[in-house]
Amino acid sequence: MRFGLPSKLELTPPFRIGIRTQLTALVSIVALGSLIILAVTTGVYFTSNYKNLRSDRLYIAAQLKSSQIDQTLNYLYYQAYYLASRDALQSSLTSYVAGNKSADNWVDSLSVIQKFLSSSNLFYVAKVYDSSFNAVLNATNNGTGDLIPEDVLDSLFPLSTDTPLPSSLETIGILTDPVLNSTDYLMSMSLPIFANPSIILTDSRVYGYITIIMSAEGLKSVFNDTTALEHSTIAIISAVYNSQGKASGYHFVFPPYGSRSDLPQKVFSIKNDTFISSAFRNGKGGSLKQTNILSTRNTALGYSPCSFNLVNWVAIVSQPESVFLSPATKLAKIITGTVIAIGVFVILLTLPLAHWAVQPIVRLQKATELITEGRGLRPSTPRTISRASSFKRGFSSGFAVPSSLLQFNTAEAGSTTSVSGHGGSGHGSGAAFSANSSMKSAINLGNEKMSPPEEENKIPNNHTDAKISMDGSLNHDLLGPHSLRHNDTDRSSNRSHILTTSANLTEARLPDYRRLFSDELSDLTETFNTMTDALDQHYALLEERVRARTKQLEAAKIEAEAANEAKTVFIANISHELRTPLNGILGMTAISMEETDVNKIRNSLKLIFRSGELLLHILTELLTFSKNVLQRTKLEKRDFCITDVALQIKSIFGKVAKDQRVRLSISLFPNLIRTMVLWGDSNRIIQIVMNLVSNALKFTPVDGTVDVRMKLLGEYDKELSEKKQYKEVYIKKGTEVTENLETTDKYDLPTLSNHRKSVDLESSATSLGSNRDTSTIQEEITKRNTVANESIYKKVNDREKASNDDVSSIVSTTTSSYDNAIFNSQFNKAPGSDDEEGGNLGRPIENPKTWVISIEVEDTGPGIDPSLQESVFHPFVQGDQTLSRQYGGTGLGLSICRQLANMMHGTMKLESKVGVGSKFTFTLPLNQTKEISFADMEFPFEDEFNPESRKNRRVKFSVAKSIKSRQSTSSVATPATNRSSLTNDVLPEVRSKGKHETKDVGNPNMGREEKNDNGGLEQLQEKNIKPSICLTGAEVNEQNSLSSKHRSRHEGLGSVNLDRPFLQSTGTATSSRNIPTVKDDDKNETSVKILVVEDNHVNQEVIKRMLNLEGIENIELACDGQEAFDKVKELTSKGENYNMIFMDVQMPKVDGLLSTKMIRRDLGYTSPIVALTAFADDSNIKECLESGMNGFLSKPIKRPKLKTILTEFCAAYQGKKNNK
């Protein structure tokens, strides 16, 4: 093994990296990681503090700036208030109101105002108004007042305009915002003048108003003062009120530094949830670390509203983000530079230290290479001494050596070994150490782990200092360092009595340097030197190892034989499943090649298409299983509601169960589960439930029940489940949902037993049609369900209408609906999600939880034997593995379900009792991310999924009988136990369209009405009688539809009755039925009469048409071996006999092998019986011939082979052929 860098770079793992490089990288990563963690923590902490401190500083600066503004305005206000409260003005206004309108009345007032204006350069113009806002007195400062333009005066005298005035004018006054006059800013302050001329009245009232135009330069100087505000920008904004008196906008009082001078004239809107809105409307101050509201770039700012009553201003102090973050940026640069410098220093220091530290390991590596190359262990002294010494050391170290090996070495005491030079080889009888190949094999075997049987064969010893490890090497973890050093000292001092080595072994040994400290590396060196001596004893273990390996090979052989047997069973089953649709495809193709009638060819193509779809379904199951086995299936998690799963199951299987006359109930418990938005792969969950429900419907007889219960069990205990490796789904204690779902039925619901409720979908549908007080949530659910149903069944109905076919496509409801279910679950929204605006499903919750959801599917089918309840989850295993099994399939459904459940950390369990039914429980944990509110709905859970709902009452209606009502309630297929009578299963779509009366197929007049291809068929069509053909597992998936459309005899197919409208496997029928004999009464009695025993409808049609092409028209069909026995018995009692019987091997009830034995033994039937089977294996052929069959016809059936069989075994066919 080389530790250095390779000469060529290896691009595939494991990558070769020297231990020196690894040590350097490890130390560097630890040092740099620690520095980075410290640097990041420090940087984040101080950066956050810097930001907080600097934002607080901006806020304090804004407060100071607003205080300065308040002081300036208050100074101007009190001077103006002083003028407004002068007695001269009050007396003049009182006299004016009393009727004295002469000029003499205003002389004193004018003098007072003139003195006030001339006393300061701050005031320019003063104008007095009466209470009706009429100007009665105007005075100006001769120095500046006459120089103000008219447009500026108009904006500064708000009382002279028609602009609405604020109500504060009547109490404290108003202040206009500064207006630019050339280079200076002016503003005006309007105050009310209160007077009380009466000595009787105590309250003063407003007799007039005074408006004073004053300079705003003092305010401007406060605005421009940026003392102690480095790189800061100051802004003052003023609120703009609308006609309702609300602050709807703002503008700048003064243009900020660097902006245009006309910026104060622009009004900006106030957005909600901004600091401007909070400051204007709530009077709150504060700071922002990052915003771009007042600038195009990011800035940090502090703001504080002014407290002056006449204005609504906000002072703002802002800084660019680069200035605001400059201290934090500087600190980050310092920390980064320091980390990089320290990292470089650590790396440079680590390189020489790592070189020095790995030198002992390098020496150990070189010594190992010498031993690996086969050099060393060449004894130069007589082998007797060396071997004895070696064994002595072995015993002292705890080794036990077989006595045979000791005897062998003693016997060789007289032999000697010669050493010649560095590469000399030793010669001795039986010395295995001299062969390089033996050395390499010994080392290689030593590196392998010993199997468990070797532990039992471990050689006992009485020494506890050292033991032989499981891989054959010394376990020196148990050796003390003193004993090792003692051995080494003894080895150096007594070389004549211990194992001596050649020059190569001397090179292999590691030198023992004098050390200051003893560590693991020194122990490793001593252990390595001891290991070279332990190689002798290693060979003693080889025999035991070979014996243990032999036992392993024997066990592996048994396991391989079991696997081979399982493979044979799988090949037999899958061969039957695949060959059955292939028989339909190839057989009908061969028939179509011989046909010239377009209708017959089209009908054959339909059977080919349905067989191809069934074959595709089987292959899809196999591929899905293979994908799960290879762990390439990935969960696609998303938000969904458990109601989505219930709706999908209802929309897919509701009609299926109704047509099958099986009561399907779906319930959700408790109602809290409906409000949860869960996170998981809803498509895979729907797939699992669909497989379980499909299985339940397949095995449930007519008038049976299938219950689907979705429960909330409690909170998920992830730690305990993970500890148990997710073998079970555990619930936290105290969170269990203890309320019993099976409570007393207060609505008189139909029950399956005394303690179990059932939600009958058929009665639910009736209730939906009769109850008009449906709540809002039910309307939404119904709407979604309608959309899902339309999307699922639209294709099937369209295909039926376009093809004018009585039988729907063989694509199963579960297969075709699954794709639609995925689509609907992704694009349809759950009720109550408030998702019309494009928002997310539901609303988030503060504390997301993980819940345990249980989905139970219980049926009243035949049940599963306890011995098979665990094996049914294995791939390709079914509850009934015999040839006479009633239900087919690949046996992958439950295996796929368990695989998907394990992927979700869930479980799949089965409880079943033979003769009672089965219950599959799928339990999994799901995270709740959101919740749905139903607060606005009066009855949010009033639907068919609630057992307590009024919609689950069974309501019966008395409807007048009519043709349509008779057709809508036409009889369905009878159970398998009654094969003497046949009825028609009609889909609701077809029933509503039918206009003719349907008669029983079992009418004894049928045989007389079917005369020939023309006349007999016309009579059959006139009376609208539909002959029924046996339904097999290949057709069980088809919809139960007998349309009122008429099929001609040339199409070769009548209307088909189906027990089960979902997909089963091929080649298995669910019930036995009377098959109308297809025969021609005009034929003479010497015509060939053949019985075809086949449970698959497609195979029946293939062989029947092939026989028709051979000129054989007198053909009878049977569905299973029991019916074949009855037909042969009935015909034998009349003194007649079939010329030949074609017998399928795998059939329900009674398989072909047992039926053949019964016919031969009990009825004495001697005519030929030819086997029909899809498993064309030599062992199967031999088994058929031993049962009493004469020939073998494999599927897919080929016409030349069929013709050969007829020629070989049917004498009547040969005679008929010769007559022609």
From Swiss-Prot:
Residues exposed to the Cytoplasmic side: 1-22, 355-1220
Entry's transmembrane regions: 23-46, 334-354
Bilayer topology: Multi-pass membrane protein
Histidine kinase domain ranges (all copies): 573-928
PTM annotation (Phosphohistidine): residues: H576
Cell compartments where the protein resides: Cell membrane
SUPFAM superfamilies: ATPase domain of HSP90 chaperone/DNA topoisomerase II/histidine kinase (SSF55874), CheY-like (SSF52172), Homodimeric domain of signal transducing histidine kinase (SSF47384)
Binding site for Mg(2+): E1094, D1095, D1144, K1195
InterPro entries named in the record: CheY-like_superfamily (IPR011006), HAMP_dom (IPR003660), HATPase_C_sf (IPR036890), His_kinase_dom (IPR005467), HisK_dim/P_dom (IPR003661), HisK_dim/P_sf (IPR036097), Sig_transdc_His_kin-like_C (IPR004358), Sig_transdc_resp-reg_receiver (IPR001789)
Purpose: Histidine kinase that acts as an osmosensor at the plasma membrane. Part of the bifurcated SLN1-YPD1-SKN7/SSK1 two-component regulatory system, which controls activity of the HOG1 pathway and gene expression in response to changes in the osmolarity of the extracellular environment. Under normal osmotic conditions, the histidine kinase autophosphorylates His-576. This phosphate is subsequently transferred to Asp-1144, from where it is relayed to 'His-64' of the phosphorelay intermediate protein YPD1. Under high osmolarity conditions, the histidine kinase is no longer active.
GO BP, sorted A to Z: osmosensory signaling via phosphorelay pathway; phosphorelay signal transduction system
Superkingdom, taxonomy of origin: Eukaryota
One function term, GO molecular function aspect: histidine phosphotransfer kinase activity
Segments for region (Disordered): 414-433, 444-500, 960-1016, 1040-1081
Compositional bias ranges of the Polar residues kind: 965-984, 1063-1075
The protein's name in its UniProt record: Osmosensing histidine protein kinase SLN1
Organism (species): Saccharomyces cerevisiae (strain ATCC 204508 / S288c)
Keyword vocabulary terms for this entry: ATP-binding, Cell membrane, Glycoprotein, Kinase, Magnesium, Membrane, Metal-binding, Nucleotide-binding, Phosphoprotein, Transferase, Transmembrane, Transmembrane helix, Two-component regulatory system
